[in-house]
A protein has these predicted regions:
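Hydrophobic pocket/interface hotspot
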Residues: 10-14, 20, 52, 63, ...
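Preference for bulky hydrophobic residues occupying beta-strand positions
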Residues: 1, 40, 50, 63, ...
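A short, structured loop/turn motif at beta-sheet edges
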Residues: 7, 53-58, 79-88
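Hydrophobic ligand-binding cavity/cleft-lining segments
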Residues: 1-32
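Short, highly charged C-terminal tails/helix-capping segments
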Residues: 121-127
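Beta-strand/loop substructures that line and gate deep hydrophobic ligand-binding cavities in soluble
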Residues: 67-118
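Glycine-rich portal/gate segments that line the openings of hydrophobic small-molecule binding cavities
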Residues: 22, 27, 31-70
Length: 127
């Protein structure tokens, strides 16, 4: 998705978990964060924790599962400049799910990531 802000702006926003609360859908409760990690509950699903693993300035962020989580996962944020005032951003979620959990959780997780992406565009372009 193309966001009408520079890759630096989007990278800086995504580099602080305190900003992620603005991206969370209504189903997320019990949000806790500091700059480098967060935890939250997705209603009727699970409590998840995340932490930053690697950050490549203005282009890539790797976030990994953290703490007691029902499955291991990572979230990658790819950010490519389009021009000085816009960038192409892609969120990629990978989860280590057994086949049964995959059937139950894949659609809600996909919806969750899609909501994050839409809200990321809205919030970044509004600021």
């Amino acid at each position: 998705m193309v966001i009408g802000r520079s890759n630096n702006h989007v990278f800086e926003f995504l580099s602080d978990f305190n900003n992620f609360e603005k991206l969370m859908p209504a189903q997320v409760t019990d949000w806790k964060s500091d700059g480098n990690s967060c935890s939250f509950n997705i209603q009727n699903m699970a409590t998840l924790g995340m932490r930053f693993d690697t950050r490549t300035p203005n282009s890539h962020i790797l976030i990994k599962s953290d703490g007691k989580v029902p499955f291991g996962f990572d979230l990658q944020c790819f950010i490519e400049p389009v021009d000085d005032n816009s960038c192409k951003t892609r969120l990629e979620f990978n989860a280590d799910l057994n086949p049964m959990l995959m059937m139950m959780a894949s659609k809600p997780l996909s919806n969750f990531i899609n909501i994050l992406a839409v809200k990321l565009k809205e919030v970044c372009e509004a600021n």
